Amino acid sequence: SSMTETIKLMQSHSSVRRFKEQEIPQEDLNEILKAAQMASTWKNFQSYSVILVRSQEKKDALYELVPQEAIRQSAAFLLFVGDLNRAEKGARLHTDTFQPQGVEGLLITSVDAALAGQNTLLAAESLGYGGVIIGLVRYKSAELAELFKLPDYTYPVFGIALGVPNQKHDVKPRLPLDQLVFEEEYQELSVEAIEAYDRVQAEYAGARATTTWSQRLAEQFGNPEPSSTRENLEQKKLL
């Protein structure tokens, strides 16, 4: 079969939000982070940084801002930061103008961070650890900037809580592949397809389900985004 160990690992991913009280050895963290660093990056700029949080005090302070149990329980919490602070230092060797403000800079930094983040999670899972990516940190950008001393030209993109798993979930059903991968040109989905996927998701979630998949889309995108994200980006000179 063409199923490698790598593919098996990738296809069996599920988020882990509960962890045992066990540390991740430094050696394992080093290997995980070296794997993260080899992710593809735009022009090799490496426009992200990682803040490794292991002190319980820091994790608790973060939990106060972003009350996700995975943060408190994690052996290590990794904050992925979109980062053009190094870029500014490099660019200023050659130019007096540094103008990273705008959408392109945000895309470059967040894509770089995301690719490194996915490598991080896969490397950790390959060593038997589990984790969850937490995007909610963006809603507390200003507070996190203070907590982690984030300078100009940086912003939190997401965090990853890592640890020894204390729970096991079934793999969450994704959309049928042909509704996500289109041969040669885009095909818009029918309302029926969305409703069918609502049913698949409801079946998977069972008693835990409080809203449908499409209801969650309405909650996320039915209103203007919170102003805090934009305000922090402006404050950090990225917008």
Residues covered by each model-derived region:
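Acidic, surface-exposed loops and disordered segments
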Residues: 1-239
